[in-house]
Each structure stands twice: as structure tokens, then as C-alpha cells.
């Protein structure tokens, strides 16, 4: 007889205990604490409602800062690629001019175009690094 009584849980108790589990995180964080109601408390029941909140500690902030610096460092690696691209473009200009000096003007215009595209990619990588550092 005792086990039958333990298995019967009132529907009001189930509703009050599972209400916190069903709500999304934003509703749990933004809602005001509710006034105590006449519904039974779920502290004595086996169902425990987990309270979800954002907690920031010194350690988690340090991890976030380290992640920012690592991401910014990884983004600035592209600037080295830009430098290598510019060197390749002007090296090819010198080789092309040595092979056929009559194409000087056309080779130079292509070299300037290659320089601009390579420099733009380097500046884009630098911009992403600054965004990671200061905008996030």
C-alpha cells in the first residue's frame, strides 16, 4: 500500500516542477521571479529543476581573451601570404621583362593589378584580425 502512494504524484506537482525545464533559456533569464503560489513545492520531489544562468568567472574571461589573441594571430598569417604574393608578382615582372622587353607597358599594368589584388587580401586579413580583437 505504501508503494502505491509513493507512485502517485499530483498533476499540479508535475506541472510546477517541469515548467522550468520546458521554458527556453531567454525566458528563464528575463522573467521576474514568480510570486509564491499555492501549488506544492517540488523541493521534496525527486524531480529537481535546474536553474539556468550565464555565469562568467575570471577563468572563463581569461579563456575568451586568449581565444581572441589566438584568432587574431591566425588571421594575421594571411598578411605574410600577401607579402609572398607581392614578391612573386614583381619577380615575374622582372623575368617577363628580361625575356621580352617590348611588352614592358603591358607587363607593368598586369604587375600593378596583381600587386593590388594581393595587397587587398592582406588588408582584408588584417581587418579580420582587428575585428576579432576589438569587435567581439
From Swiss-Prot:
GO biological process, one term: proton motive force-driven ATP synthesis
PTM text: Trimethylated by ATPSCKMT at Lys-104. Methylation is required for proper incorporation of the C subunit into the ATP synthase complex and mitochondrial respiration.
Keyword Iron-sulfur: no
Subcellular localization: Mitochondrion membrane
Keywords tagged on the record: CF(0), Hydrogen ion transport, Ion transport, Lipid-binding, Membrane, Methylation, Mitochondrion, Transit peptide, Transmembrane, Transmembrane helix, Transport
Principal location listed in the UniProt entry: mitochondrion
Transit peptide location: 1-61
Pfam family, one: ATP-synt_C
Molecular function as annotated in GO: lipid binding; proton channel activity
InterPro entries xrefs: ATP_synth_F0_csu, ATP_synth_F0_csu_DDCD_BS, ATP_synth_F0_csu_sf, ATPase_proteolipid_c-like_dom, F/V-ATP_Csub_sf
Function: Subunit c, of the mitochondrial membrane ATP synthase complex (F(1)F(0) ATP synthase or Complex V) that produces ATP from ADP in the presence of a proton gradient across the membrane which is generated by electron transport complexes of the respiratory chain. ATP synthase complex consist of a soluble F(1) head domain - the catalytic core - and a membrane F(1) domain - the membrane proton channel. These two domains are linked by a central stalk rotating inside the F(1) region and a stationary peripheral stalk.
Similarity remark: Belongs to the ATPase C chain family.
Protein name: ATP synthase F(0) complex subunit C1, mitochondrial
Source species: Mus musculus (Mouse)
Organismal lineage: Eukaryota, Metazoa, Chordata, Craniata, Vertebrata
Amino acid at each position: 500500500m505504501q508503494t502505491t502512494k509513493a507512485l502517485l504524484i499530483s498533476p499540479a506537482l508535475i506541472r510546477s516542477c517541469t515548467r522550468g525545464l520546458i521554458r527556453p533559456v531567454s525566458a528563464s533569464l528575463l522573467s521576474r521571479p514568480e510570486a509564491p503560489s499555492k501549488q506544492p513545492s517540488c523541493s521534496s520531489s525527486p524531480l529537481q529543476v535546474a536553474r539556468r544562468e550565464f555565469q562568467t568567472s575570471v577563468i572563463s574571461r581569461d579563456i575568451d581573451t586568449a581565444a581572441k589573441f589566438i584568432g587574431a594571430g591566425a588571421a594575421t598569417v594571411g598578411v605574410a601570404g600577401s607579402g609572398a604574393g607581392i614578391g612573386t608578382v614583381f619577380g615575374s615582372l622582372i623575368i617577363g621583362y628580361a625575356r621580352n622587353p617590348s611588352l614592358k607597358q603591358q607587363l607593368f599594368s598586369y604587375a600593378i593589378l596583381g600587386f593590388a589584388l594581393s595587397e587587398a587580401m592582406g588588408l582584408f586579413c588584417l581587418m579580420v584580425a582587428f575585428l576579432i580583437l576589438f569587435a567581439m
